[in-house]
Amino acid sequence: MRTAALLLPFALAASFTSAPLLAAPASPAHATAPQSQLRLQTFHPGPQAMFSVSSVLIEGRHDAILVDAQFGASDARRLVDLIRASGKQLTTIYISHGDPDYYFGLATLQDAFPKARIVATAQTVAHIQQTQAGKLAYWGPKMGSDAPKRLVMPQVLEGGALQLEGERLPLIGLDGPTPDRSVLWVPSLRAIVGGIPVVAGEHVWMADTQTPKSHADWLQTLQRLQALKPKVVVPGHYAPGAALDASALRFTADYIRAFDAEAAKAQDSAALVRAMRARYPTLAGVESLELSAKVAKGEMRWP
């Protein structure tokens, strides 16, 4: 396996965060290993965004792959600017999950890069097909001019990996208990990218996983990701300033266990929210916690 040291300089702009994760020369201990030619840039729309969803540009020498397309059209346009500034040819847009904050920006990306293929796993495509009309009806009026002018359906990705300039980038989790919750693995950078299983710096969205088995499966997925010993982890959702490393895996697993423990003791959602905020007083995304707590305590149905 190719290895590379990673440098993580973060540049905060007024409207978004672009975090280049640069592949540096291999350390002397691995001097004979081929050096990775890949480089990551992350895009985050900033704290003012409706959803803190990330996008990642995986760059080779000449070509690039984009992971996830943003939610609002204005953020997607800023993402277009980042891609163009890279000077690389965008060959592929990969959508890592079927919720609208991952793909509503596709029309903007497709207009800017019409030759790029747009793909997702069969599970993600099925999720989008089943939910896109309802999601647009709900979110469209709230988004106003930021709403997508059309919805773009990804093609089903054949096989379990992407390819970039001869390097295979496998999807991890397709053969696990929850194939709809996979992530992309960049072996030469030891980087986990995209998907919904991992969160950093904000309350974890628990409303979509409502059974003990779903939480056990989730923890199993996180354990599998930890076994990869990643150097970089770019979650599908993270708060600006969060560490993009393996600590996100530990945080997510600890949060799931804490939520389960507090939900079992709490009399109602308000008590559950208080308990989780006491455990995690600095996390962003309290609105997500409040809704998740209501679902967990049977006070509302979701979706």
Regions found by a protein language model. Name each.
Residues 17-31:
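Signal peptide processing junction and immediate N-terminal pro/mature segment
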Residues 74-119:
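Active-site metal-binding motif and surrounding structural segment of the metallo-beta-lactamase
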Residues 71-72, 126-250, ...:
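Metallo-beta-lactamase
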Residues 7-20:
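Bacterial N-terminal signal peptides
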Residues 1-5:
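Positively charged n-region of N-terminal signal peptides that target proteins for export
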Residues 28-30, 227-232, 240-303:
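Accessory terminal helices/loops
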Residues 34-85, 183-196:
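Conserved beta-strand hairpin/beta-sheet module of binuclear metal-dependent hydrolase folds
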